[in-house]
């Protein structure tokens, strides 16, 4: 079985307001995590005021724990303070504590934390891939990948996923490194999805940008499962690390998503506002991607999946929020422990775009979120039946072949 990444985060179905703070409700079927929440602060909050708020939360939570009958909860876990944009935190709180937090005038909204996971579709081992050849050619059916020898050299791709087998031969014994882990205590890809995605971005055989550096940011465990709060923490870590090394030389790939989540979209927007290019899978439910997050965030590059025959993959989401199509059906790339496997999904399409972004940065095309416009301008108008109100543009690296 191949893999499609699917997140089941929080939906903005409706909102209740208590003294100014929205408590966002969830749609039926969303797998929320019991008594776990994400709290987002008002825009423009200073670090000093944020520290003061969190101190109040910790004090209030401790007082509640020692009261008779107060339910034992873990309290605050992750703190979010993106270099630009989103400030907030996640944690384990009872209903009364959340009501107290919601009364604060400095709180913008609260969402329930939710489970994130990947779903399997199909897998066939050891067959040739077509995606690379399609990216480097203006005509379908080719078997050769044409590209400039710069191949993304000097760029860094952050893969927010299940981790990456950094020892895989695809990464030449050093181009892939471990970043951070917000999923479990095992710094390895015990699922396989993240290694496949990394190989499409920067593998020496399967990669679009064959000389780019890969950084593994693990937010999903061996079962392909994690939390929305952990994913956002991975997004923050990647943004901060990219900015410390040069945001204009960095790209981020997120082959995950799901139902609309304001927090997820706000975090994606913060990456873009931080000057970092972000490619995101459109989703695999054959619906309008405006219903998905972070795919529906307009400041990022949202990618739908195409077939070898230049059609829309039957599972791919569509709609006005889609920026481009990229190969996503039956894509060969690396698997943990060596060798390759074939997976399908918009999860496989998105890293073609992240790799193309790194490739173009290496060519001196400039970096940052505006690179998505360059990619759209270079794309070719070939996708058949792309879906209602959807672009028919397929990515191309401009090699002229």
From Swiss-Prot:
InterPro entries: PCSK9_ProteinaseK-like, Peptidase_S8/S53_dom, Peptidase_S8/S53_dom_sf, Peptidase_S8_His-AS, Peptidase_S8_Ser-AS, Peptidase_S8_subtilisin-like, Peptidase_S8_subtilisin-rel, S8pro/Inhibitor_I9
Enzyme Commission identifier(s): 3.4.21.-
Single GO cellular component term: extracellular region
Primary residence: secreted
Role this protein plays: Secreted subtilisin-like serine protease with keratinolytic activity that contributes to pathogenicity.
Family recorded in the similarity comment: Belongs to the peptidase S8 family.
Protein name: Subtilisin-like protease 7
